[in-house]
């Protein structure tokens, strides 16, 4: 699989802080995405702070990460992203992203999102054989909040499985898609170096980021 080099998108400006929210399922590398963002910011000479907002990221449970990036470390006071202050949402899980807690962080005219449209059933719902995810309603809820032009949906889990043989790379694909759409104020060089420093499945993760 030969991946052509990506053109550098027009990166977003950082006014005070640039606020990212990463959602997903515990055990799928959500916390790793937050750590990669923070490390890449450091490598780019910027300030960064991240925190996990769902207690322990237990396997199979919903989790979300708040990450603030600033031009200088001293510009970051609080790490928690406040209501209507998310600049970008990296949505690794549709149900979590369309939940009221995450929607409250978004604002029409400010927030943009890339969301995995794959249907992942979490927690107690896995024990209910009749339960199905109202995907269309969840997609519409996000579009209603920030506008259809500000959100991109794709089944990144299936794409990851098809292209790289495992859905575990879906979250890094979503990060790559967000970066390619000008939603992450960090250089490609810093993000790739952060993936290398993380040291896990480096080649596959870089491919996933670039797809």
Residue ranges with predicted function:
Residues 1-23, 28-211:
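Active-site cofactor/cluster-binding pocket
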């Amino acid at each position: 699989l030969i991946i052509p080099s990506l053109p550098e998108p027009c990166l977003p400006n950082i006014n005070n802080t640039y606020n990212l929210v990463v959602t997903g399922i515990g055990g799928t590398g959500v916390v790793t995405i937050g750590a990669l963002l923070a490390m890449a910011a450091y490598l780019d000479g910027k300030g960064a702070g991240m925190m996990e907002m769902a207690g322990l990221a237990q396997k199979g449970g919903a989790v979300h990460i708040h990450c603030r990036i600033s031009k200088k470390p001293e510009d970051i006071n609080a790490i928690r992203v406040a209501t209507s202050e998310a600049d970008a949402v990296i949505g690794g899980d549709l149900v979590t992203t369309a939940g009221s807690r995450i929607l409250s962080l978004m604002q029409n005219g400010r927030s943009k999102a890339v969301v995995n449209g794959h249907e992942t059933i979490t927690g107690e719902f896995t024990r209910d054989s009749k339960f199905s995810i109202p995907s269309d309603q969840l997609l519409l809820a996000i579009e209603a909040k920030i506008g259809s032009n500000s959100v991109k949906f794709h089944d990144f889990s299936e794409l990851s499985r098809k292209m790289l043989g495992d859905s575990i790379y879906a979250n890094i694909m979503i990060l790559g898609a967000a970066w390619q759409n000008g939603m992450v104020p960090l250089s490609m060089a810093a993000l790739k170096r952060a993936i290398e420093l993380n040291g896990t499945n480096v080649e596959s993760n870089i491919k996933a980021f670039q797809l």
